[in-house]
């Protein structure tokens, strides 16, 4: 009897690792995952790790969508669980998405792989992710700031972000942050205006009387991030591209500095208008 059961499991495991293009195979229940982590490096390398709890039943782990390479699955002892197909196997859905089926195990399982999902555009790297459970996105130390669904986040001493309860996200970050520092000097006061963009910037100007900052962007569809002191130019703000009002995102970097983020669809003159500005000094 035991020999027959072993034969059924062994044959089933052999079938499981064969790609199936027209059927979806789910064995047992969804796995209980202790950790779901995606790590993004400055060079665009995407590394994913799942830590799966032990179970006395077969369980299935859905992998992230995309082109997967360097897939390994080991137990807590570091033993290869793919060996002989007796402990784990791969299943494919009709769209080619991969899942890992883990057979009953008294140890936690660790799944690791790389995703070929980064889309490079000059110096800006983009990845779109989606998962049905809470997962973390960790960034290498060289990455200073990211865009999460078009919202800018300065990492500073934070390692990354967590998407609670899962969901989809568009992540963007620079492989080499392109900073332009413009100094505004007014009498004895000096203010730095920092512009982060892959676009060439010309004709930067600060006008105290009109409470505005202006500059020329020379490329279309490029993210432009402006960081400046609220003391220099306070909000609320209006931003124009060649006299046409455009959308922008605003956040605070810290207590004193605001961040404005835009993406002009065409090249032209950007004008940022505030409602408050440093007072004029008497001559």
Q: What feature does the model see in each segment?
A:
Residues 9-17:
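Bacterial N-terminal signal peptides
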Residues 21-280:
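Lumenal/extracellular ectodomains and adaptor appendage modules
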């Amino acid at each position: 009897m035991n020999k027959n059961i072993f034969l059924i499991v062994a044959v089933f495991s052999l079938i499981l690792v064969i790609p199936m293009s027209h059927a979806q195979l789910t064995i047992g229940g969804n796995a209980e995952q202790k950790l779901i982590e995606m790590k993004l490096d400055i060079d665009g390398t995407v590394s994913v790790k799942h830590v799966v709890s032990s179970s006395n039943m077969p369980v299935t782990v859905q992998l992230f969508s995309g082109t997967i390479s360097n897939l390994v699955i080991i137990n807590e002892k570091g033993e290869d669980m793919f060996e002989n197909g007796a402990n784990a196997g791969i299943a494919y859905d009709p769209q080619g998405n991969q899942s890992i089926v883990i057979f009953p195990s008294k140890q936690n399982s660790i799944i690791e792989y790389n995703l070929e999902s980064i889309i490079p555009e000059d110096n800006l790297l983009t990845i779109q992710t989606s998962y049905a459970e809470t997962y973390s996105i960790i960034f290498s130390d060289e990455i200073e700031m990211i865009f999460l669904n078009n919202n800018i986040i300065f990492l500073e001493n934070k390692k990354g972000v967590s998407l609670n309860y899962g969901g989809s996200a568009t992540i963007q970050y620079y492989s080499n942050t392109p900073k332009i520092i413009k100094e505004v000097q007014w009498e004895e006061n000096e203010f730095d205006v920092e512009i982060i963009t892959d676009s060439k910037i010309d004709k930067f100007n600060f006008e105290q009387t009109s409470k505005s900052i202006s500059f020329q962007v020379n490329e279309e569809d490029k993210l432009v991030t402006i960081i400046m002191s609220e003391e220099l130019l306070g909000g609320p703000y209006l931003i124009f591209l060649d006299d046409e009002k455009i959308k922008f995102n605003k956040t605070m970097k810290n207590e004193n500095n605001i961040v404005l983020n835009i993406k002009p669809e065409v090249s032209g003159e950007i004008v940022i208008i505030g409602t408050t500005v440093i007072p004029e000094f008497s001559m």
